[in-house]
Regions:
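HotDog/MaoC-like acyl-thioester-processing domains
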Residues: 1-16, 88-137
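Catalytic strand-loop segment that frames the active site of acyl-thioester-processing enzymes
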Residues: 1-54
Length: 137
């Protein structure tokens, strides 16, 4: 069994996406059957008054957080993930996924509760909590 108490307050290693890829947004829009053109059409974004950048889909933003957790504790570590989308992420933005261990939920199953977030230029754009199964120390 892994001793979890020392983990409380531990920062989860961050994951940085140096430039959110617009071509992935277009692919994701097709996969999700998302007809909203602001995910791939710069002109549509201009017409809506949000500038010349396309907006990243929420599932892609959440995937950055999920990948950060998986890199930290492995592919089966995520038990529960709850997130709130606060601000948009645009094509070309740099984003950083991060988190911190808040509490031990169950010593016998190595389960911890974590604060998670995605930031864009030092502003939180996604925030939430995750229940993570600790498999690595």
């Amino acid at each position: 069994m892994i001793e979890l108490s020392p983990l409380i307050g531990t920062d989860i290693p961050t994951l940085t996406i140096n430039s959110v890829d617009e071509s992935r947004m277009k692919t994701m829009a097709a996969l999700l059957r998302d007809p909203y053109p602001v995910h791939w059409d710069h002109e549509a974004s201009k017409q809506l008054g949000i500038g010349n950048k396309v907006i990243n889909q929420g599932p892609l933003n959440l995937s950055y957080i999920a990948n950060m957790l998986i890199y930290w504790q492995g592919p089966t570590c995520i038990k529960r993930l709850k997130a709130k989308f606060l601000k948009p992420v645009f094509g070309g933005d740099t984003v950083i996924a991060g988190g911190k261990v808040l509490e031990v939920l169950d010593d016998t199953s190595s389960l911890v509760n974590c604060d998670i977030w995605l930031s864009r230029y030092q502003q939180t754009v996604v925030s939430g909590v995750a229940e993570i199964i600790i498999t690595r120390k």
